């Protein structure tokens, strides 16, 4: 898709279909698996990238020859997502991969899917039913990592703001739990404000602006997402930029390299959008009988001021809202994706290799 604003991409519902290619014996597929992505929320750039890399993967081998893929958005509405899942069960899909609107509210319908022989894989905002496999990073550790770094930078004392995520999701709950674990060990740190940023830069900027004038000196920022928006609100209020622990937004990392003339000391931890592709690969391999039914935890990528690198982990020419962890890197990379896959869902050149943990 063309590069357009976040607001124009926010939608309460959406559906796409991708029937890509014919079965190819070279990739071991005699029939194509019907695999559907059920996404609860499309209101930020991370979710858009997550869907885009899923779409791009469907256009690349081995998925092109082995998978008929579809994707659906429910506007963060549990009832609507449940109805879409009901429709997928009726369509007799082979697998459902889901980024859920609620950790518990969809368990019943997902149990029905599993009872009909449909493979269910939950990623990012996972569900609690044991009938669904889980693909994720360690979200409690995510929150702890941000808070640990911040506590050290603040020498264990000072005022912190917490910018949280989408309420009611497992990711939001677990990240907050991780941070609170660290604050409990550092009684000198006071959380002076806790409010949602919805994992969205514009929302985080607006909500920060609305509370900032009433707050005392802020010595640290802990932010689940929308980090660059929080920093922009500080600049607009003529506040100094304190040490900041946040997500993998390109705009935040631009601040970390001082690209805009304002440099911040930070740690940027990423929840990789390619979790959708890892889930797709897990489904493909299980349906092919080449991988066991098991949960997968992958490491989350992160950078500090010492390790952030232009052209690899920050991109000055891309929008601030772009999430830089769209691909993995290094000798043990889970996968490698091109920028266009994340920007508009276009295929990268060559075959897409996704490395799952040892079975």
Protein language model features and the residues they cover:
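Short amphipathic alpha-helical segments with coiled-coil-like heptad repeat character
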Residues: 1, 17-18, 63, 151
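N-terminal secretory signal peptides and thylakoid transit peptides that target proteins
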Residues: 1-16
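A residue-level marker of the well-folded mature domains of exported/periplasmic proteins
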Residues: 9-11, 27-359
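N-terminal signal peptide c-region/cleavage motif recognized by signal peptidases
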Residues: 21-23
């Amino acid at each position: 898709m063309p590069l357009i604003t976040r607001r124009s991409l926010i939608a309460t519902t959406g559906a796409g279909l991708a029937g890509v290619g014919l079965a190819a014996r070279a990739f071991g597929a005699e029939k194509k698996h019907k695999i559907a992505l059920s996404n609860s929320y499309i209101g930020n750039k991370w979710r858009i990238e997550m869907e885009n890399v899923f779409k791009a993967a469907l256009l690349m081998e081995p998925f092109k020859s082995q998978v008929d893929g579809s994707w659906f958005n429910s506007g963060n509405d549990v009832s609507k997502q449940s109805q879409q899942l009901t429709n997928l069960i009726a369509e007799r899909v082979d697998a459902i991969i889901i980024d859920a609107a609620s950790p518990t509210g969809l368990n019943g319908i997902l149990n029905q899917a599993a009872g009909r022989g449909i493979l269910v894989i939950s990623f990012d905002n996972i569900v609690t039913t044991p009938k669904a496999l889980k693909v994720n990073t360690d979200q409690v550790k995510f929150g702890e990592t941000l808070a640990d770094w911040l506590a050290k930078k603040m020498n264990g004392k000072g005022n912190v703001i917490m910018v949280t995520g989408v309420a009611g999701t497992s990711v939001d709950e677990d990240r907050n739990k991780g941070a609170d674990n660290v604050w409990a060990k550092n009684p000198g740190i006071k959380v002076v404000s806790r409010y949602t940023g919805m994992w969205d830069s514009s929302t985080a900027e607006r909500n920060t602006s609305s509370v900032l004038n009433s707050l005392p000196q802020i010595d640290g920022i802990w932010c689940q997402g929308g980090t660059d928006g929080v920093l922009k609100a500080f600049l607009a209020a003529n506040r100094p930029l304190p040490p900041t622990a946040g997500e993998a937004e390109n705009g935040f990392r631009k601040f970390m390299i001082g690209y805009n003339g304002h440099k911040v000391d930070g740690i940027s931890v990423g929840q990789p959008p390619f979790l959708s592709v890892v889930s797709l690969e897990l489904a493909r391999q299980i349906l092919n009988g080449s991988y066991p039914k098991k949960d997968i935890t992958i490491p989350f990528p992160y950078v500090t001021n010492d390790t952030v690198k232009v052209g690899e982990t920050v991109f000055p020419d891309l929008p601030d809202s772009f999430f830089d962890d769209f691909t993995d890197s290094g000798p043990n990379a889970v996968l490698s994706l091109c920028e266009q896959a994340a920007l508009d869902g276009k295929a990268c050149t060559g075959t897409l290799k996704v490395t799952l943990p040892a079975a």
